[in-house]
Amino acid sequence: MTNKFLALPQSTRVLAFTQVAEKRGITPFAVEKDWWVSQTLKAVFELDVAEHLVFKGGTSLSKAWNLIERFSEDIDLAIEREFLGFEGNLTKNKKTKLRKASGQYISEVFYLELQEKFKEKGLENVTFSLAETQDSDQDPRIINIFYPNIIEVTEYLKPRVQIEVGCRSLIEPFTMKKNSAMVDDEYPEQSFSEKSEEIPSVNPERTFLEKIFLLHEEFQKTA
């Protein structure tokens, strides 16, 4: 399969990124990164495990909910613990086993299937790397995706999409929200434009609560 947008001449793609950036008052590199983030989300939610995943975190607040302006490389995902064979209230020992099971699934199955999905979708010349871990029960696990940027790199943004997949968060409540790239939104009638797809995105109230809890944990560590 050939990706229609990537099949365009590089000069045409650069022009598209630049025009969208000028219209939205952001950098062309941010528009390019947004395209790759959108493609990554589409690939993730076309996997067999998709019904057991939700999109969460700060990037979901901007990408899915349009509540904040943020150009991040991070895609935070939560995987349903029941999918990994764990239900109900978990003891400390069970939580450790859950994290180990999640890490094993992400590194041995999810990581490989995602690479195959990229190839299937015609997303070529992309490099994947799985972040090294010190412990077998480390959660979340991180996957780095380095894409072939055609816009000059900025100091703040790198040509990388980073996926964090964790098992500790509950997947509810969530709402099906639109995922589309800025380029597709601005040029909906062009032959390269892809239709938006809805993906399960954690409700913002829960995301804000999780951020507060994380800050509390960090404060407790330094207190």
Predicted regions and their residues:
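Short charge-dense sequence patches
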Residues: 6-11, 54-66, 183-194
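Active-site nucleotide-donor binding segment shared across nucleotidyl transfer reactions
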Residues: 45-75, 79-87
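Short secondary-structure transition/capping motifs
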Residues: 29-33, 67-68, 95, 99, ...
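Helical scaffold of the NTase/Pol beta-like nucleotidyltransferase catalytic core
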Residues: 1-54, 66
